[in-house]
Regions:
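Generic cytosolic/nucleocytoplasmic N-terminal low-complexity/intrinsically disordered segments
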Residues: 2-3, 88, 116, 122
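Short, surface-exposed beta-strand/strand-loop-strand elements in extracellular ectodomains
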Residues: 92-107
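Serine/threonine-rich, low-complexity intrinsically disordered segments
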Residues: 18, 100, 117-118, 122, ...
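Residue-level detector of intrinsically disordered/flexible regions characterized by low predicted structural confidence
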Residues: 5-9, 34, 119
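Generic preference for well-ordered secondary structure
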Residues: 4-7, 123, 144
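Gram-negative bacterial Sec-dependent N-terminal signal peptides
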Residues: 1-20
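Extended, solvent-exposed segments with strong compositional bias
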Residues: 107-131
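N-terminal small/polar-rich segments of proteins
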Residues: 19-94, 127-167
Length: 167
């Protein structure tokens, strides 16, 4: 009888050892690069066919701040607008956009090379964020409507895209 109990217990022990489980491993990654709008842009209307963020034209340039906790892991990519996200109906498709992105303020003097090392393509400027700290970028945008055509009265909205891209 004792032998039978041992054999049954040994069989149960083997069955228990053969059991498998699939534990999960979870983690959350918090970005070490953040983007904040510090100044909303405003279009000035210096002439009937021009909308501009230039202060000389009555506009306000939008400013975004990048906060980087650990340098050399991110790119700052800023795209100025080439269309309106909201506007009155425009009867002509002859709408020309220009724009630019510039470093306006830095928290670390070494960040001054960001402008020199920037890569520009289409309407996007990419910066290699090599140092920890904060950098402010000002964006200029200008839309010119048709040949001697006035913008219709109404509200015009265009969007800047500012993002942190992991290297």
């Amino acid at each position: 009888m004792f032998k039978k109990v041992l054999i049954v217990m040994a069989g149960l022990s083997v069955a228990t050892m053969a059991h498998a489980d699939n534990p999960t491993i979870r983690g959350t990654v918090a970005s070490k690069c953040s983007v904040y709008t510090t100044t909303q842009g405003v279009f000035g209307n210096p002439s009937p066919n021009t909308l501009s963020t230039a202060p000389a034209d009555g506009g306000v340039q939008p400013i975004v701040r990048y906060d980087v906790a650990i340098g050399n892991y991110y790119y700052g990519r800023i795209t100025y607008p080439t269309s309106f996200t909201s506007s009155p109906n425009l009867t002509s498709s002859a709408l020309e956009w220009t724009g630019d992105v510039d470093v306006s303020q830095v928290s670390v003097p070494g960040m001054s090379v960001y402008t020199t090392n920037a890569i520009t393509y289409d309407n996007t400027v990419q910066y290699d964020l090599t140092l920890a700290g904060s950098t402010w970028f000002k964006i200029s945008s200008e839309a010119t409507y048709g040949y001697n055509q006035a913008f219709p009265a109404g509200s015009y909205v265009a969007s800047v895209v500012a993002e942190c891209i992991a290297k």
